Design a protein with these regions (language model features):
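Hydrophobic secondary-structure block in the mid-to-C-terminal portion of proteins
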Residues: 145-178
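Alpha-solenoid helical repeat architecture
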Residues: 15-19, 41-46, 75-79, 90, ...
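Amphipathic alpha-helical scaffolding segments comprising HEAT/armadillo-like alpha-solenoid repeats
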Residues: 2-12, 32-43, 61-74, 95-106, ...
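Structural detector for internal amphipathic alpha-helices that build alpha-solenoid repeat scaffolds
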Residues: 21-31, 49-62, 73, 81-93, ...
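Long, contiguous N-terminal structural blocks used for assembly/anchoring
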Residues: 2-30, 152-155, 177-178
Length: 178
């Protein structure tokens, strides 16, 4: 089998998508020696694999650090089976993922659904200090007044963490309603 088929078969045969990570640590341990090539392959091919999502969460952001930006792409559609595991892994990456989040918000302006899922899947799980680092980016998102809900989510996160004053929240909210 090609290396690609090998990784796919190993994922399918080793990981049980019905079980939590804790329930299958021994099986997941078989991936402890995963190669960088295989990680790249995971990133490029396996967004539709629930097992891959479980593996990402198990491997954790430290091991996946050079490829975090690739796994951020799994959040372009939260209905993809691996998106949940990717978002939980990336939430824990904290500071490490902020430059990549910022890049997507600034450079990929037309993919507001992706912005929406990044906010919901990662940013809202950050602590206040990390969210404060993204304050300007979030305000910029609010001001874009998109139709996909990213602006509303950005405002909700700013408000919920008291990063902008109630007056500012109110003013932005009125702007969004207009």
């Amino acid at each position: 089998a090609t290396s690609e088929m090998k990784l796919y078969q190993k994922l399918e045969n080793t990981i049980d998508w019905n079980k939590s990570i804790e329930q299958q640590l021994d099986r997941l341990g078989e991936f402890d020696d995963i190669t960088d090539e295989e990680i790249k392959e995971l990133a490029q091919t396996y967004h539709k694999s629930t097992e891959a999502g479980i593996l990402l969460e198990y491997l954790g952001f430290e091991r996946l650090k050079p490829y975090l930006n690739l796994f951020l792409e799994f959040l372009q559609d939260m209905n993809w089976p691996a998106a949940g595991g990717a978002s939980r892994m990336l939430s824990k990456a904290g500071k490490e993922i902020i430059p990549d989040i910022r890049r997507v918000l600034e450079e990929v302006k037309n993919d507001q659904i992706w912005h929406y899922w990044i906010l919901l899947g990662i940013v809202q799980d950050f602590d206040k200090e990390l969210i404060s680092e993204l304050k300007d980016d979030l305000i910029e998102l609010v001001n874009r007044r998109d139709k996909e809900g990213a602006s509303i989510q950005a405002l909700r996160i700013l408000k919920g963490n008291q990063i902008i004053s109630e007056e500012e929240v109110e003013k932005h909210y009125q702007d969004l309603l207009d």
